């Protein structure tokens, strides 16, 4: 019997990286998984793998930069399954823009995708969870939500905001809904590769106890903990999964 048997879990940004690994793990643990992303081919591939391994999943094509994102994901989920038990706000973007040159649009794009879309979707699912008397929301922040990294001014700002949002939501939604966050360090993902990969993050890697990049599966295992009764006395927390940065 899986830890998430019969539960419905929305995982945004789950066509690659940490979200995809979490979708696979949640499905193995019995969840009905709602995969979201912008690319239908990649989304279908994730759903196909889940089904091939005996799991259940659907995908929703939705762009977290669009104001219709939350409503689209919520409506499609309710249409398919009629409820929501777990939401993992994982969709995000990483801009390289620096303080001196970033434009208003670049800055606001990061804020909207990384924070606002999570808030809007959480607002949609919260009443469903409250009516059931239980629910879990997991916000993906970042290690840079604790300390800045040079050159990522919008990303750093958005992830600090995600830390604050997680704490605020936990206060307002307790005791019915558990709200916690994950602060990944440098994780081996397509997003990290898009901004230069290991070379760009080598200074951070050198400051970790483990001296390596993390794997998406290592984020997924923490997400599973936060999505189940294993974390029944954990609320409003931001768990750093960073290999031991600056310990």
Kindly label every feature range from the protein language model.
Residues 122, 158, 166:
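Active-site helix of classical SDR
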Residues 98-99, 103-111, 192, 200-204:
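Substrate-binding pocket helix/loop in short-chain dehydrogenase/reductase
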Residues 127, 170-175, 232:
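Alpha-helical segment proximal to the catalytic Tyr-Lys
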Residues 8, 15-17, 39:
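Conserved glycine-rich cofactor-binding loop
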Residues 88, 174-178, 234-236:
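Short, small/polar-rich loop/turn modules that mediate ligand/substrate recognition or access, typified
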Residues 142:
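Residue(s) in the substrate-gating loop at a strand-loop-helix junction
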Residues 119, 134, 212-241, 246:
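C-terminal substrate-recognition "lid" of short-chain dehydrogenase/reductases
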